C-alpha cells in the first residue's frame, strides 16, 4: 500500500501479527495468513519508492550481506501492490476495486531493468512530447485468482508526478491541458 496509515487496514485480515515496525514513511506488519508468512508494507507514492522497496525486499532474501553477492539459491517473492487511484471513467465509483489488465507507464523506470520473465509488452506513442510509453499486460493466471463479481477489470496509468503529468494545474502552464480527457 502507499499510505502507512493503510497498513493496519490490510493486516487486520491476517490470522496473527508477529511484529510491527515503523521507520520514516515505511510501516510494516509481519504475520501469518492461512499458515503462510505474510507482510503488509507501505511504499509511499510513485514508482521511485516502489523501486526501492522491490530492490530491498529482494536483497533481504537473495543477497548474502557478508559478501554482497547473490545467494546460490534464489527465492521468488510474491508481491501484490494495493493502491488507490483516481478514475477517468464516470461509471467507476470511488469505492470500487479495479484489477489492472493493462498498465501504462509514462515514467521511464522500466527502461533501467532487463526482466527475465516475459510479459506481454507494448510501446506506443500517446503524445509526441512524452515519447514512447510502455504498456504491460497483467499475468492472466494472477488476474483469474482475484477476479470476482466484486471487482472490475480495467487499465491503469502510472504518471511520473501528481500535478502536470496527471493534468492538474496550479500556476505552471501545462504542455497538454487535457491529457486525462484524451486518455479516457
Spans of model-derived segments:
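Active-site rim beta-loop-alpha module in soluble metabolic enzymes
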Residues: 121-184
Amino acid at each position: 500500500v502507499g499510505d502507512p496509515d493503510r497498513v493496519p487496514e490490510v493486516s487486520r485480515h491476517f490470522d496473527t501479527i508477529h511484529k510491527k515496525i515503523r521507520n520514516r514513511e515505511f510501516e510494516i506488519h509481519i504475520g501469518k495468513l492461512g499458515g503462510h508468512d505474510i507482510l503488509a508494507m507501505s511504499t509511499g507514492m510513485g514508482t521511485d519508492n516502489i523501486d526501492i522497496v522491490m530492490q530491498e525486499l529482494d536483497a533481504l532474501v537473495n543477497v548474502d550481506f557478508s559478501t554482497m553477492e547473490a545467494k546460490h539459491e534464489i527465492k521468488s517473492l510474491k508481491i501484490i501492490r494495493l493502491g488507490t487511484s483516481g478514475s477517468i471513467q464516470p461509471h467507476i465509483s470511488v469505492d470500487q476495486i479495479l484489477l489492472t489488465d493493462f498498465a501504462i507507464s509514462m515514467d521511464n523506470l522500466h527502461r533501467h531493468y532487463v526482466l527475465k520473465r516475459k510479459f506481454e509488452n507494448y510501446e506506443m506513442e500517446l503524445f509526441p512530447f512524452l515519447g514512447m510509453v510502455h504498456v504491460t499486460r497483467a499475468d492472466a493466471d494472477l488476474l483469474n485468482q482475484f477476479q470476482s463479481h466484486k471487482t472490475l477489470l480495467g487499465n491503469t496509468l502510472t504518471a511520473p508526478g501528481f500535478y502536470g503529468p496527471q493534468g492538474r494545474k496550479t500556476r505552471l502552464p501545462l504542455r497538454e491541458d487535457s491529457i486525462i480527457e484524451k486518455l479516457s
